[in-house]
Amino acid sequence: FNNLPTTAPLAPITARVRPEAQRGRFAVRRAVAALGYQETINFSFVEAHWEQDLAGNANPIKLLNPIASQMSMMRSSLLGSLLQVLKFNLDRKAPRVRVFELGRVYLRDDSVATTDSTVRGVHQPMRVAGLAWGDADESRWDGKSERIDFYDVKGDVEALLAPLVPSFEAAEHPALHPGRSARVLVDGKAVGFVGELHPRWRQKWDFAQAPVLFELDLDAVTARPVPVAQSVPKHQAVERDIAVVVAEAVTHDALMQTIRAATAAQGLLRDAMLFDIYRPQPLRDGAVAAPGALAQGEKSMAVRLSFQSDSTTLTDEQVEPAVRAIVEQLGAKLGGRLRG
């Protein structure tokens, strides 16, 4: 043994430089933690009924030799693990729970070949998911408390994806409330979902309050546009306020998309912000609405439009055609009209 030569192991060292348009996983962890969530680390093995109930996965990947009977499937969603963490905390009287996990899920995909980091037939994307339950704020100066709701967690998703600007569209998910859930899109591509737990699963898990959850593809969360320098505007912006009467079913997203599409060719619109919604009071029996008043089933949406040019100060003659184009498009696509 003493005659064996001392030879240091040799291995190539290759620097892995992350692209500037991508942030690391630890940066994502810090960002979610800064929103008030605590990280959890869970098994990738889950119960069989989680896959059916929460992920809608009719063909999950089954383990040949599970370590326990209740851990017989490879997860295709992180939600079941977070719900189990919530249940554990509530059984120990936790008053407020906000947790997240960053981990892999496992999906069948025949196009995946075997490599150093993949297994044939199994797609293993990374995802980040979060769950919030209890009061929206840990403590308030006035002593009042408000329960966490869909919009609180939706704001967390927007903050996590910033500076990218996601859009949200109503969608159904096996784990989520059909009327309080949405698909998350970035540049028109679906990257995840956010919503309140389905009442059926809330009752099954015996939660006094429905938690709000989100799950996003990690690639979408780590993507970052490279900053581009631009000059400070030299000319003052011009603002116009319009109040548009539309049907109750018209959404904020549909309104904003129509406004931006109407002025895309001109390139003068810098911002559009909804600042007020008015709905008429229900009429009493036998009462008649005043002439020109909003009908039942209608609402008024007030929007502040901001126009600006990089080369000159805008005049009324330049702004008014853009406003007219917006009003015409709102009438043609959404059936809207200016409020009298």
Where are these regions (language model features)?
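Extended, well-folded interaction surfaces typified by the phenylalanyl-tRNA synthetase beta subunit core
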Residues: 1-97, 304-314, 318-340
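A carboxyl-terminal module marker
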Residues: 3-5, 12, 42, 49, ...
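Short, charged low-complexity intrinsically disordered segments located at boundaries
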Residues: 20-28, 59-61, 109-120, 183-190, ...
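Short secondary-structure boundary micro-motifs
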Residues: 37-38, 55, 114-115, 167-169, ...
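Acidic-residue sensor for enzyme active/binding pockets
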Residues: 39, 101, 215
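Flexible beta->alpha loop and helix N-cap segments adjacent to enzyme active/binding sites
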Residues: 47-153
